[in-house]
């Protein structure tokens, strides 16, 4: 009894300290029983009645609390039970029991060594209803034996120190509606300070704008997947889900919700945009402030309303400021030239806040009373166009002479159609003069002699009055117009005498009316006879017919001879040679085979381009943007919409303003060449525009641009089969050109275009190129130089361009493709390239290049052009490789490489090098001399230790020279083993 009293005294004095530091209960724990919160007696059943005893105390707030204690340590065989009241389970699947208790150290109590215990037992029993005061021990299931981590002694009693223990045990799963807990004392001195029973749940939460409800874990093994619901004013982007763990924790958030248009995320909710702000789209972006000249007056706005006289076009984004129509154009100036006028004006002072300002020209023909006007004739032409002008100038032609016109220049932008105010325009009135005659189109040579030429021509198509006379201008071609003669003729023919024999003369003719002279005709060249023999135009035709007939008879005789030879057994005797009928070094082309016609043989380039190309109406073409600058002007992308056909994307080359006649001939000459080709691997000409300005060449649009830059951009991203497919397309296109008798002269990856389907097409059909006597030896066009790295040796040395020289170039293209656009011969100078190729050196195989493809490269680079394969053979070889992909898996090995590769210097005698500079010259890296000299690599030992990283550090960063130097170093090491080699 003294023992029990000591516990009572200790509890009553120390229970305050036990609860002095309150720890907040976690939000994921739900109490089913908490003895500290029960007011009044607990009313638990104690059996036997003299066992557990209920006592009272107070907490730190002096609130009464109830505890149980037992301390029957003097008697043997103690079996004291304490049972709680019936506890409803609610939704718990697993429960936790938290016990706070004190326990007396048996060693501190005298005379109880045989009867005192330091543990007690915890039991539970499930039931669907309350059993009242009935108590049966055998119905309870043991949970655990509870021992104290710390027990108190007699000394602690004296110091009034209470050592409180806390133990937690799990119970479950529980299935019935409720349960009892029971505590069995077997002889301990123990006091139950508090009992708490709880279960864990995942509490309500909001994550990624999705609400997840309170969730109780199902069991201890698996996670519970919970589907979330979006908060108000939001919608699912991805279905929101989270997993509830057995510890009551939310894990692995998946999916999310986003705020509706007009709402933004604030404080885990979607709240309406404030007035003056808007949000146009669903999503978790913030509300934005209304753009200039717009506002909102209510919450939750999805867009802002424009102010009065401001508008938003249908295609304008909500974030764009509201705009208004532009003001009228300013400072209109007219420059009249007979029956045409050039109108210039200044931009409006106010563009309305937009960049899409364009101008429309309204033309009115007026009587002598300016107020009486009518629309102009549809024959009036506007250059570049009448509507949608982006520049502040327009040329109007084909007006009537001596007529009053009024031109109204409208300024419009993207919101002009939405505006109710009147049109914003500036007007100018003009009166045309009498027009000069149009040019003479054609000059015909009627008769020539050694000192005279007779010419005739047609009257101009538009005389614009009575022709008074014609001015004939002529000069010797070699004089280049430095000295010329002019005479006048009243009719449409003239004989010019006192000319030099066997001399070419250039003629131009223009007509004159009361309004003045028209423009000169284009230049025509005619030659006088070398002697007194003269021949009329009609006689020359007779002679030509006779010559043609004679040639036809000869050819017919040859054909008959061949047929007789076949009949008499020629086939058996010459079977291998009968495929072609040979004439010298060439062969007879049979009827039906299409042959390339050089457009430069036409006197009039317009005639050639109209024969081979389709004339397009400029109104069917729309230009989107400028993508580059070409040889004669800008290169643009745009769209072509022909009547009854689908709109297509096109590339557009334009002839720049201020072009010369020669530039126009060359520009149209390229179209005349392209127009003759029709092949899936040749760039397709859609047509030309020559009847309005600017003059344009329109081709199909290739989305991926030039092949070399495309490959560099997608380095190592294609399979070998895909690369071979590209090469096969190029070879097929070149076979077509070769069969037509066309020599490209500039075949390189930069001149191959590739579309979105990886189809390669040959382009850049060539203007005349002149080989300079420059040691760098580059072929020159009017647009720049073409490096000789793609040019065959005979073309460099003898200006001999053939289909075989195109095959050499194809081998370089093959190397470019397999190296993903690497520059042939790297940083070698052109002079070094010429020297190396003449000495038999060839490019090495690119990394991981199939042996079959590298062998094809070497075949294309045969010095004797007759030994190179034909394009027909190249196509056949590539077809076989595509059908047999396994043959492409054999990679060119170092051992199998020929010894004449540019980067294989094993055949170079290292002992011949006296200095580092000599060595670098010998391995084609002379440009590295200063680098190595600067870092004092001057001996064999130091050279042999250089690594790739070392070269990068000293400035040799290009892969080609690195490989050459490393290859030479390996050879140097081999020779160094046999003795020192000064370098």
Curated annotation (Swiss-Prot):
| Keyword tags | ATP-binding, Cell adhesion, Cell membrane, Glycoprotein, Kinase, Membrane, Nucleotide-binding, Phosphoprotein, Receptor, Repeat, Secreted, Signal, Transferase, Transmembrane, Transmembrane helix, Tyrosine-protein kinase
The record gives the effect of mutating residue 660 to K as:
In a lung carcinoma sample; somatic mutation
Modified residue Phosphotyrosine is at which positions? Answer: 596, 602, 701, 779, 937
Give me the glycosylation sites of this protein.
232, 337, 391, 404, 493
Naming one, the record's GO cellular component terms include: cytosol
Q: Which PROSITE patterns match?
A: EGF_2, EPH_LBD, FN3, PROTEIN_KINASE_ATP, PROTEIN_KINASE_DOM, PROTEIN_KINASE_TYR, RECEPTOR_TYR_KIN_V_1, RECEPTOR_TYR_KIN_V_2
Q: Which residues bind ATP?
A: 628-633, 653, 700-706, 750-751
- What does the record say mutating residue 621 to L does? In a colorectal cancer sample; somatic mutation
What reaction gets catalysed by this protein? L-tyrosyl-[protein] + ATP = O-phospho-L-tyrosyl-[protein] + ADP + H(+)
A single GO molecular function term of this UniProt record: transmembrane-ephrin receptor activity
Which residues belong to any copy of the SAM domain?
Answer: 911-975
Substitution effect: residue 806 to N: In a colorectal cancer sample; somatic mutation
Which is a Pfam family this sequence falls into? Ephrin_lbd
E.C. no:
2.7.10.1
In which tissues has expression of this protein been reported? Widely expressed. Highest level in placenta.
Ranges facing Cytoplasmic side: 566-983
| Recorded consequence of changing residue 207 to N | In a pancreatic ductal adenocarcinoma sample; somatic mutation
Q: How is it modified after translation?
A: Autophosphorylates upon activation by EFNA5. Phosphorylation on Tyr-602 mediates interaction with NCK1. Dephosphorylated by PTPN1.
Q: Can you state the subunit structure given in the record? A: Heterotetramer upon binding of the ligand. The heterotetramer is composed of an ephrin dimer and a receptor dimer. Oligomerization is probably required to induce biological responses. Forms a ternary EFNA5-EPHA3-ADAM10 complex mediating EFNA5 extracellular domain shedding by ADAM10 which regulates the EFNA5-EPHA3 complex internalization and function. Interacts with NCK1 (via SH2 domain); mediates EFNA5-EPHA3 signaling. Interacts (phosphorylated) with PTPN1; dephosphorylates EPHA3 and may regulate its trafficking and function.
* Identification of the protein by name: Ephrin type-A receptor 3
Q: Which organism is it from?
A: Homo sapiens (Human)
Which gene specifies this protein's sequence? EPHA3
